[in-house]
Amino acid sequence: MREQPKNQISPDGLKVWRLQEIIISAVCLLIVIAVAVLSYYFHWPYWISGVLGAVWLLGSIVTVFIIPKVRHKVWRYEVHEHEIDIQSGIFVVTRVIVPMVRVQHVDTSQGPLLKKYNLATVKISTAATVHSIPALEMEEADRLRDSISRLARVTDDDV
Protein backbone atom coordinates (compact mmCIF):
# COMPACT_ATOMS: atom_id res chain seq x y z
CA MET A 1 0.00 0.00 0.00
CA ARG A 2 1.23 3.48 -0.85
CA GLU A 3 2.16 6.07 1.72
CA GLN A 4 -0.12 9.06 2.17
CA PRO A 5 0.66 12.07 0.01
CA LYS A 6 3.03 14.38 1.88
CA ASN A 7 1.74 17.87 1.06
CA GLN A 8 -1.12 19.50 2.93
CA ILE A 9 -3.10 22.55 1.94
CA SER A 10 -2.46 25.98 3.46
CA PRO A 11 -3.51 26.61 7.08
CA ASP A 12 -5.29 29.73 5.78
CA GLY A 13 -7.58 27.35 3.90
CA LEU A 14 -9.13 26.57 7.28
CA LYS A 15 -10.06 30.26 7.68
CA VAL A 16 -11.58 30.37 4.20
CA TRP A 17 -13.67 27.25 4.79
CA ARG A 18 -14.87 28.62 8.12
CA LEU A 19 -15.85 31.94 6.53
CA GLN A 20 -17.75 30.08 3.80
CA GLU A 21 -19.62 28.08 6.42
CA ILE A 22 -20.37 31.22 8.46
CA ILE A 23 -21.94 32.81 5.37
CA ILE A 24 -24.04 29.69 4.73
CA SER A 25 -25.05 29.58 8.42
CA ALA A 26 -26.09 33.24 8.28
CA VAL A 27 -28.37 32.54 5.30
CA CYS A 28 -29.84 29.54 7.14
CA LEU A 29 -30.39 31.72 10.22
CA LEU A 30 -32.42 34.13 8.07
CA ILE A 31 -34.62 31.19 7.05
CA VAL A 32 -35.06 30.16 10.70
CA ILE A 33 -36.01 33.74 11.59
CA ALA A 34 -38.48 33.85 8.68
CA VAL A 35 -40.11 30.64 9.93
CA ALA A 36 -40.31 32.12 13.45
CA VAL A 37 -42.00 35.26 12.10
CA LEU A 38 -44.42 33.16 10.04
CA SER A 39 -45.13 31.03 13.12
CA TYR A 40 -46.08 34.18 15.01
CA TYR A 41 -48.35 35.60 12.27
CA PHE A 42 -50.02 32.33 11.30
CA HIS A 43 -50.21 30.92 14.85
CA TRP A 44 -48.17 27.85 14.04
CA PRO A 45 -46.82 25.86 16.98
CA TYR A 46 -43.75 27.60 18.39
CA TRP A 47 -41.90 24.33 18.84
CA ILE A 48 -41.31 24.29 15.06
CA SER A 49 -39.20 27.45 15.34
CA GLY A 50 -37.47 26.10 18.44
CA VAL A 51 -36.52 22.83 16.76
CA LEU A 52 -35.33 24.65 13.64
CA GLY A 53 -33.27 27.02 15.80
CA ALA A 54 -31.68 24.12 17.68
CA VAL A 55 -30.91 22.26 14.45
CA TRP A 56 -29.41 25.47 13.01
CA LEU A 57 -27.25 26.02 16.11
CA LEU A 58 -25.96 22.45 16.22
CA GLY A 59 -25.40 22.36 12.45
CA SER A 60 -23.56 25.68 12.54
CA ILE A 61 -21.25 24.55 15.33
CA VAL A 62 -20.40 21.34 13.46
CA THR A 63 -19.95 22.95 10.02
CA VAL A 64 -18.04 26.04 11.22
CA PHE A 65 -15.76 24.58 13.88
CA ILE A 66 -15.42 20.81 13.43
CA ILE A 67 -15.70 19.88 9.74
CA PRO A 68 -13.21 22.47 8.38
CA LYS A 69 -10.57 21.35 10.88
CA VAL A 70 -11.00 17.67 10.01
CA ARG A 71 -11.20 18.50 6.30
CA HIS A 72 -7.91 20.39 6.52
CA LYS A 73 -6.28 17.44 8.26
CA VAL A 74 -7.30 14.88 5.61
CA TRP A 75 -6.67 16.89 2.41
CA ARG A 76 -3.31 15.85 0.98
CA TYR A 77 -1.63 15.87 -2.39
CA GLU A 78 1.67 15.04 -4.02
CA VAL A 79 2.98 15.46 -7.55
CA HIS A 80 5.27 12.76 -8.91
CA GLU A 81 6.98 12.60 -12.28
CA HIS A 82 4.30 10.35 -13.82
CA GLU A 83 1.23 10.98 -11.66
CA ILE A 84 -0.60 13.26 -9.25
CA ASP A 85 -1.77 11.73 -5.96
CA ILE A 86 -4.77 13.43 -4.28
CA GLN A 87 -6.41 12.30 -1.04
CA SER A 88 -9.55 13.83 0.47
CA GLY A 89 -12.67 12.96 2.40
CA ILE A 90 -13.84 12.88 5.98
CA PHE A 91 -16.13 9.87 6.29
CA VAL A 92 -15.26 8.30 2.95
CA VAL A 93 -11.59 8.84 2.17
CA THR A 94 -10.99 9.12 -1.57
CA ARG A 95 -7.58 8.58 -3.09
CA VAL A 96 -7.18 9.63 -6.73
CA ILE A 97 -4.12 8.94 -8.86
CA VAL A 98 -4.12 11.08 -12.01
CA PRO A 99 -1.62 9.86 -14.62
CA MET A 100 0.28 12.74 -16.25
CA VAL A 101 -0.52 11.33 -19.70
CA ARG A 102 -4.23 12.01 -18.97
CA VAL A 103 -3.81 15.66 -17.98
CA GLN A 104 -5.25 17.97 -20.65
CA HIS A 105 -4.80 21.31 -18.93
CA VAL A 106 -4.22 22.86 -15.51
CA ASP A 107 -5.89 26.02 -14.15
CA THR A 108 -5.69 28.09 -11.00
CA SER A 109 -8.75 29.93 -9.73
CA GLN A 110 -9.52 32.36 -6.91
CA GLY A 111 -12.83 33.45 -5.47
CA PRO A 112 -13.17 36.53 -3.26
CA LEU A 113 -12.43 34.66 -0.03
CA LEU A 114 -9.43 32.83 -1.47
CA LYS A 115 -8.13 36.11 -2.86
CA LYS A 116 -8.44 37.78 0.56
CA TYR A 117 -6.03 35.19 2.00
CA ASN A 118 -3.82 35.01 -1.12
CA LEU A 119 -4.89 31.42 -1.86
CA ALA A 120 -5.91 29.61 -5.03
CA THR A 121 -7.38 26.31 -6.16
CA VAL A 122 -5.51 24.23 -8.74
CA LYS A 123 -7.83 22.44 -11.18
CA ILE A 124 -6.44 19.52 -13.16
CA SER A 125 -8.56 18.61 -16.20
CA THR A 126 -8.59 15.20 -17.83
CA ALA A 127 -10.92 13.90 -20.54
CA ALA A 128 -13.17 12.36 -17.88
CA THR A 129 -13.31 14.94 -15.08
CA VAL A 130 -11.70 17.83 -13.23
CA HIS A 131 -9.68 17.20 -10.07
CA SER A 132 -9.11 20.06 -7.62
CA ILE A 133 -6.54 20.84 -4.97
CA PRO A 134 -8.09 23.65 -2.90
CA ALA A 135 -6.69 26.45 -0.75
CA LEU A 136 -3.04 26.50 -1.75
CA GLU A 137 -0.91 29.59 -1.23
CA MET A 138 -0.82 31.51 -4.51
CA GLU A 139 2.90 30.97 -5.07
CA GLU A 140 2.54 27.24 -4.40
CA ALA A 141 -0.51 27.05 -6.70
CA ASP A 142 1.39 28.77 -9.53
CA ARG A 143 4.42 26.55 -9.00
CA LEU A 144 2.24 23.43 -8.90
CA ARG A 145 0.29 24.45 -12.02
CA ASP A 146 3.50 25.11 -13.96
CA SER A 147 5.11 21.90 -12.72
CA ILE A 148 2.11 19.73 -13.66
CA SER A 149 1.86 21.45 -17.03
CA ARG A 150 5.55 20.85 -17.73
CA LEU A 151 5.43 17.20 -16.58
CA ALA A 152 2.25 16.51 -18.57
CA ARG A 153 3.81 18.04 -21.69
CA VAL A 154 7.00 15.98 -21.30
CA THR A 155 5.00 12.80 -20.70
CA ASP A 156 2.79 13.59 -23.69
CA ASP A 157 5.85 14.12 -25.91
CA ASP A 158 7.28 10.77 -24.81
CA VAL A 159 4.19 8.83 -25.90
From Swiss-Prot:
Keyword RNA-binding: no
Pfam families: bPH_2 (PF03703)
InterPro entries (alphabetical): YdbS-like_PH
Chief subcellular location: membrane
Protein's UniProt keywords contain Transmembrane: yes
GO CC terms of this entry: plasma membrane
Record's keyword terms, sorted: Cell membrane, Membrane, Transmembrane, Transmembrane helix
Subcellular location: Cell membrane
Residue ranges that the Swiss-Prot or TrEMBL entry lists as coiled coil: none
Topology within the bilayer: Multi-pass membrane protein
Spans through the membrane: 22-42, 47-67
Similarity section: Belongs to the UPF0699 family.
Entry protein name: UPF0699 transmembrane protein YdbS
Lineage start: Bacteria, Bacillati, Bacillota, Bacilli, Bacillales
